[in-house]
Swiss-Prot record:
Keywords: Cell inner membrane, Cell membrane, Chaperone, Membrane, Transmembrane, Transmembrane helix
Span of the signal peptide: none
UniProt-recorded name of the protein: Periplasmic chaperone PpiD
GO MF terms held by the record: peptidyl-prolyl cis-trans isomerase activity
Domain (PpiC) ranges: 228-355
Family, as annotated: Belongs to the PpiD chaperone family.
Length: 621
């Protein structure tokens, strides 16, 4: 029992997650049966149609799910064309995958027994009354969906076949021993290397750049050299926490009296239980308890609940509002009162009320600071709403008179410094505000401090009124202002090209065994170091792409590191460091789980390759 109470929430969460997975992948096409539309279809999968209505309904459902998950962020992207297209394509691909899986199970003659389907139907909550199957409810449901009993059974069989197929694929999470050994060997590999660093800055400083090269680069890259449009904004910002609000002791007292239930510890009750497998066992125990036998002793000896039995049946303190229904129906109101036998799942309970901690009200002195904050917040919210409504009315009447709005409301505006898209002030870092500022036509850029945005009401009780104080157009920079940048860029390009060509020649000499070139070019290697695939080094893939050294012949490569310097790497030795048994198990487990997804995707890709899928043009979806 106690295990059941503690794990109830986790079970619900797990069931929800599994439900979402199954519904999104397996039961997606159920609307094909409930919304038969033979006039319009979106796609045909091996001759089987996906109706326009099915896709439309699932698209709407998916958008609702997105809104729940994303919350306020959904408003920012819901009209985005790319986002809508991605949602549409995702739904359509899921529907196609569903049909391909159903068709595959049909070809493979997957078959679910009738008695299994009967159990499922009998246990569906919407067909039950008083925890028992209700035939009338079932038939009414079929009638509402325009289905016969046999069609519904066929539909469930088809969906369950698909579910079993997915489960079968997910259970093939093994990796062959030979594959395991290869992967473990690969992951455990270590390499001993030496590096010689050729610094780029001295080479950059030695490069020469002509005026012609500078002019040509400027002409070819003009779009990279411009000053973005810039703004100075004058604005009104309304937020409840910006108002200076006072609160008297009298207000605190009145608030406390009106809301006293908020400032109390809820009643708590302590219960003990005895859980049995059969009703006869429960009756026998209840008879003993009525004769005065010790509840705690019997719970330890005879209760089958593994958690509470060790505590003499005690399941701890429970706040009155959260007492489970199994205990509520016992209707225990007196200390030491014992319930009758209560059916619980397939078992039986006897419950005892041990103690009651009555509701306790906190003193006003304990909660006065909390109440003061609540009053101030409520008053500031009221002040905010009144001022917001006042400004909204004045702004509507004075469309091109930001200055007049300030005068009538007696508000001093805030003003920003110059900013562009990459340096928006913190107060204006809101997608809606940024759109109004930067999108042409939403704010008049000519009527400075006259035109305004109208009152913009954001979430979290925040409002803005914006006006442009000053504006600079986007313009190409003059060559004289960016000449130094171009010179540095060209010097760097030349230095990189020159260094690459030189190092390629050096590597060629090293490859044919001429290691004297290192001394000639004054290339000095650092100390040996050991590297693994897990090192946080952006160039680690280059090191592990080097071939293994053979017959004591050194292997070399080159790359550019994060500091832009060039590196010649010498691979001296390759060896494997043995993992512990525990580490190997963790790696294999991870690979197996990853393998499920890869297997399933490959399976779907194979079904797609063999299928004939025709798409119908959809305008104004």
């Amino acid at each position: 029992m106690i295990k059941y109470l503690k794990s109830r929430l986790n079970i619900i969460i797990v069931k929800c997650i599994l439900g979402i997975i199954i519904l999104s992948l397996v039961f997606g096409t159920i609307n094909n049966y409930f919304n038969r539309d033979t006039t319009r279809y979106i796609a045909k999968v091996n001759g089987e149609e996906i109706s326009f209505i099915t896709l439309q309904k699932m698209y709407i459902d998916e958008r609702k799910k997105q809104e729940k998950i994303l919350g306020q962020d959904f408003e920012k992207i819901k009209k985005n064309k790319k986002f809508k297209e991605e949602t549409y394509n995702y739904i359509l691909s899921q529907l196609i995958n569903n049909i391909l899986l159903e068709q595959y199970t049909k070809r493979m003659n997957f078959n679910i027994q009738d008695n299994e389907i009967k159990k499922i139907i009998f246990n569906i909550p919407i067909f039950q009354e008083n925890n028992e199957f209700n035939k009338k409810k079932y038939l009414n449901y079929l009638s509402s969906k325009n289905l016969t009993h046999y069609e519904y059974v066929s539909l469930i069989r088809k969906k369950l076949n698909t579910t079993y197929l997915i489960n079968a694929i997910s259970e093939t999470d093994f990796i062959l021993d030979n594959e395991q050994k290869k992967i473990i060997k690969l992951l455990s590999e270590k390499r001993i290397i030496k590096k010689a660093i050729i610094k780029i800055n001295p080479i950059i400083n030695n490069q020469k750049v002509t005026e012609k090269e500078i002019n040509n680069y400027f002409d070819q890259h003009k779009n990279e050299f411009y000053t973005p449009e810039k703004f100075k904004i004058s604005y009104i910002q309304l937020k409840p926490n910006k108002f200076k609000i006072q609160c008297s002791n009298e207000e605190i007292k009145n608030w406390y009296k009106k809301n006293i239930d908020k400032y109390s510890n809820q009643e708590r009750r302590q219960y003990s239980i005895i859980q049995t497998k059969t009703k006869n066992e429960a009756l026998s125990i209840l008879s003993e308890l009525k004769k005065g036998e010790d509840f705690s002793k019997i719970a330890k000896e005879k209760s089958i609940d593994p958690f509470s039995s060790e505590q003499g049946g005690n399941i701890g303190w429970i706040t009155k509002n959260f007492v489970p229904n199994e205990i509520k129906i016992a209707n225990l109101e007196k200390i030491d009162q014992i319930s009758n036998i209560i059916k619980f799942n397939n078992n039986f309970l006897i419950i005892k009320l041990n103690k009651i901690l009555p509701k306790k009200y906190k003193k006003i002195s304990e909660v006065s600071d909390l109440i003061e904050n609540e009053i101030k917040y409520q008053k500031s919210l009221n002040t905010y709403k009144k001022l917001k409504d006042k400004i909204a009315i004045i702004a509507k009447k004075n469309i091109n008179r930001f200055d007049l709005i300030l005068k009538k409301t007696n508000i001093l505006p805030k003003e920003t410094n110059w900013f562009d898209k990459d340096s928006v002030p913190k107060e204006l870092q809101n997608p809606i505000l940024k759109k109004i500022i930067f999108k042409k036509g939403l704010l008049d850029r000519q009527k400075k401090l006259k035109s305004h945005s109208g009152l913009i009401v954001l979430n979290d009780h925040q409002s803005f009124l914006l006006s442009i104080k000053n504006f600079q157009k986007k313009r190409i920079k003059k060559l004289k202002d960016i000449k130094r940048n171009i010179v540095n860029k060209l010097k760097y390009i030349k230095a990189v090209e020159k260094t690459k060509n030189k190092l390629k020649k050096i590597l060629f000499q090293l490859k044919i065994g001429n290691e004297h070139i290192l001394k000639k070019e004054n290339i000095i290697f650092e100390e040996y170091e050991t590297v693994s695939r897990y090192d946080k080094n952006p160039n680690i893939s280059v090191i592990f792409a080097m071939p293994h050294p053979k017959e004591e012949k050194n292997v070399y490569t080159m790359y550019q590191n994060k500091n832009k310097n060039f590196v010649i790497a010498l691979l001296d030795k390759v060896y494997n460091e043995k993992f512990s048994n525990e580490e190997e198990k963790i790696i294999i487990k991870y690979l197996e789980k990853n393998n499920i997804d890869v297997t399933f995707q490959c399976f779907l890709q194979n079904l797609h390759r063999k299928a004939t899928i025709l798409y119908n043009k959809t305008d104004n979806f």
